[in-house]
Swiss-Prot record:
Ranges for domain S1 motif: 620-688
Organism encoding this protein: Sulfurihydrogenibium sp. (strain YO3AOP1)
Gene that this polypeptide is encoded by: pnp
Residue ranges of domain KH in the record: 551-610
Ligand binding (Mg(2+)): D484, D490
Keyword Lipid biosynthesis on entry: no
Family of this protein: Belongs to the polyribonucleotide nucleotidyltransferase family.
Major subcellular location class: cytoplasm
Name the UniProt record assigns to this protein: Polyribonucleotide nucleotidyltransferase
EC numbers on record: 2.7.7.8
Amino acid sequence: MEEIKIETVVNGAPYSIETGYFAKQANGAVIVRQGDTAVLVAAVMSEEPQADIDFLPLTVEYREKYYAYGKIPGGFVKREGKPSEREILVARNIDRPIRPLFPKGFYNDVIITAYTLSADDQYDPDVLGIVGASAALHISDIPFEGPIAGVRVCRVDGQFIVNPTYQQKAKSDLEIVVAGSKDAIVMVEGGAKEVPEEVILEAMLFGHQEIKKLIELQEELRAKYGKEKIEIPIDEEEILLKEKFKELAYVRIKEAFNISDKKERNKQINAIFEEIKTTLEIPEEKVKKASFVYKDVVSNVMRDLVLYENIRIDGRKPEEIRPIWIKVGVFPRNHGSAIFTRGQTQAFVTVTLGSPSEGQIEESIEAGETLKRFMLHYNFPPFSTGEAKPPRPVSRREIGHGNLAERALEPLIPSEEEFPYVIRVVSDILESNGSTSMATVCGGSLALFDAGVPMKKHVAGIAMGLIKSEDKFVVLSDILGDEDHLGDMDFKVAGTRDGVTSIQMDIKVKGLTREILQKALEQAREGRNYILDLMYQAIPEPRKELSPYAPTVTTLRVLPEKISVIIGPAGKNIKKIIEETGVKIDLDPTGLVKIYATSKIAAEKAIDMINQLIMDIELGEVYLGKVTRVEDYGAFVELMPGKLSLLHVSQISSERLKSAKDVVKVGDVLKVKVSEIDDQGRIKVSLKDVPENVEAKNKFLFE
């Protein structure tokens, strides 16, 4: 069996692509390795194209196998379940750089499957999946205008590193995944800690140099093992139909683009199609195909208006941002809320504060179980675009958009020491016409300020677009949905006035030059600063006080050995405090106790109960105690967990008793007064001198 392996070195570790001895029934399959991490990627194509579609039916599935890490899945079911959020995000990162590189008119189903087969504690397998997908397609007979490659770039101590180790990633202030062809960058995804745009650009270009090396590996692999590509037939009928639509509809579509309202504009454009369809007497079975051709003409009109007349769909200039309307503190019961409206895009964003126990427990194969204290959930209901569709489960798109917005805000979220709350941000998109994820970033920052989360700065986001011809390009600020759909780029940039915190770029052309990237980043910074000015006008700083409906946090410091006393046997004591007060309690082995309560009264009651548990016994004070043992000479009374006292027979009654057993028994609860504490801490109590109207200091223990 033939085994072909092409090797190089990346970040000091061996890096290879191999094929020839596995998954041979797939159209193309490779294994990509870095160090001891290995990812298998297989590409399969259907025999026939799908009918009546105008998009590529591409599916990417990425799965991290437990066996790759030498582990068995936890829980009752001992096999991998549905894809995790991380696996979905990695699959999207594999999909996005390869999708623009399939030829127009290719409508066969393509399935890309990536499995992590082996994983060390050094190198993340996700970027190997990008290279593997490209290599599998490149050596296959599937039409593909690649190859491309993907790398991760981090900056540690001012130095860029390609495909860093996990340890290097943890120290970085910038982390981006860059994918590109030999000539240009095609995809970027990542985050940073307020890093300037110039550094982001240099990181992209640094990664592109390494990408070229990985593309050479793929070219060498194809030269040794590549299959002949299938040909996509030219549709002459489609070409003729497009010319007819241009002749009859171009000018009228151009006039329709003067309508700023999205619904009215689309209604007019659709009416033009219906009229010309009748004029051309297009048969019913070819109407769908004709509608796809008409869409191309609509796209051409929009692009020509921008490129040659500097006119956008809604009449704005290329760098102009839509009107913005902001409202904070929208509803009284939310801990924080904001509505951020930009043109016909609107996000209602809320913030809810909770205790550490309410954080998101995340289980990853590599890191195990971790607790996430800041989370952002993005929801995109069908009504936001006026569609009459039933609600759907959370989509991959919603997960991806939420992750992008979360990454934008996270660098400004205060540490747990500064702000001991779990923070959940929810963005419900109420209207959509482009850039909802960036509206979520803006609305999220406003809602966090409204909630009183002590963020040092606002974060804003903007989506940039691109219209490009062979000899000209125009960068668009704050793109509409149609500009995203019909344009060549969707470049989202979020950050503060001081730098970028999150970035995501997808393109539909074969790559972007340094000039275009630089122009887009500079124009994004100008737009972001304009939006930030409006946000600071709406709410210039975080509120000084939390919502009265937010949980209060009280912190106590106790001796570490007292933690077990607070918990009690089988959790008896802490359960009782929680049941009686409704609070949530977070205990740290260092002796830090955090009490989360819905009211000040509940917090004070919980503190009092904890103090009763851990207090020192004081001479002359009155306590309740349970009899644990009885002898003739007296009874042993437990005042608090682990605190025993002696009730001598002479201190039980003013009358002389022969034996304590005549009066008390095990299990009796007595109200006693501390009469003596000796040098060794031994406690003696009395029943004789107890005032009737004095409450026991530890009464809650016996209620």
